[in-house]
């Protein structure tokens, strides 16, 4: 089992956004989030808390045009940081799953730290993508975030909305269930010798 610190510091600077992100996979869930998109701050704070990942994000962007660029770019950087912090993935549990309710909403997430980016995202009710959940954060942004994280972290992720009416509840349950599943998958297991794959690499 690896004894190296599983931390990362990633920055991204484009004409659309400026992002500085630090994380510690073996943290306590502490966070300092400032993305200039308040609802996204709320979701990333929930992700950190429930995945026990210490997370600091400072970001600015062209949110006067749309929040899309900033939201997606932070997802990209978060995915890159997760990949970097995981290292060679030695000693991890690898798989995680979680079923999380938020009042009437219920979401299941399954995570495999596989090295093979793949997202299955389903079950959101009709009209969810167009709904303004908080400020200019629409339901469509939720999928964009998971796509960015999944691709850049090298994860296989299934997020399934099993029920819900309130868009805020649905989105928050998605982030929390993903966080809980990721927490299980990234955990170090002293019984795991080396990389948890019969191929010897992830």
Swiss-Prot record:
Pathway listed: Amino-acid biosynthesis; L-histidine biosynthesis; L-histidine from 5-phospho-alpha-D-ribose 1-diphosphate: step 6/9
UniProt-listed Enzyme Commission number(s): 4.2.1.19
InterPro entries: IGPD_sf (IPR038494), ImidazoleglycerolP_deHydtase (IPR000807), ImidazoleglycerP_deHydtase_CS (IPR020565), Ribosomal_Su5_D2-typ_SF (IPR020568)
One of the record's GO cellular component terms: cytoplasm
Highest taxon listed in the record's lineage: Bacteria
Compartments where located: Cytoplasm
Coarse class of the protein's main subcellular location: cytoplasm
The keyword Transit peptide is annotated on this UniProt entry: no
GO BP, sorted A to Z: L-histidine biosynthetic process
Catalytic function, reaction form: D-erythro-1-(imidazol-4-yl)glycerol 3-phosphate = 3-(imidazol-4-yl)-2-oxopropyl phosphate + H2O
Keywords: Amino-acid biosynthesis, Cytoplasm, Histidine biosynthesis, Lyase
Gene Ontology MF terms in the entry: imidazoleglycerol-phosphate dehydratase activity
NCBIfam families listed in its UniProt record: PRK00951.1-6 (NF002110), PRK00951.2-1 (NF002111), PRK00951.2-4 (NF002114)
Family, as annotated: Belongs to the imidazoleglycerol-phosphate dehydratase family.
Protein name as catalogued: Imidazoleglycerol-phosphate dehydratase
Species this protein is from: Clavibacter sepedonicus (Clavibacter michiganensis subsp. sepedonicus)
